[in-house]
């Protein structure tokens, strides 16, 4: 019991936390799969490496990211208290995915309080994986 009390005393709480889970779905519906992996295996599309959560509370901004293949993430208690605008962005090995290659949920506004966790639930990020490449009629694909 004393160990639990000591461990709890070591937790650094400056704000609230945010928890979310994610799945990737094909944008066009051409895929026979309802969901796709972070590495879609499609020529012209490269793996989504990480998922990033950005927040803005007043003039304060911050972010946290997790390996895409975790499909779940929780920030530390670092999100400032107040009305937070929360956005999710897929990240490629070379940086942010091009906005035309994915559709994420619209920014969510949530009230954050010190020591509490806001749960965004399970979100779906739609990724472009059809007609990838540089030929005529092709389009930009996720992380391509």
Functional labels for PLM-detected ranges:
Residues 1-4:
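Sec-dependent signal peptide recognition
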Residues 6-9:
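C-terminal motif of bacterial Sec signal peptides marking the signal peptidase cleavage site
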Residues 11-17:
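Bacterial lipoprotein signal-peptidase II cleavage site
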Residues 12, 40, 70, 94, ...:
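Disulfide-rich extracellular modules and peptides
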Residues 21-43:
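Short amphipathic, basic-aromatic surface patches that mediate peripheral association
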Residues 56-73:
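Short, acidic Ser/Thr/Gly-rich low-complexity loop/linker segments typical of extracellular
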Residues 67-70, 91-133:
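Structured interaction patches on ligand/partner-binding surfaces of diverse proteins
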Residues 68-94:
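Short Pro-Gly-centered beta-turn/loop motif in secreted/extracellular proteins
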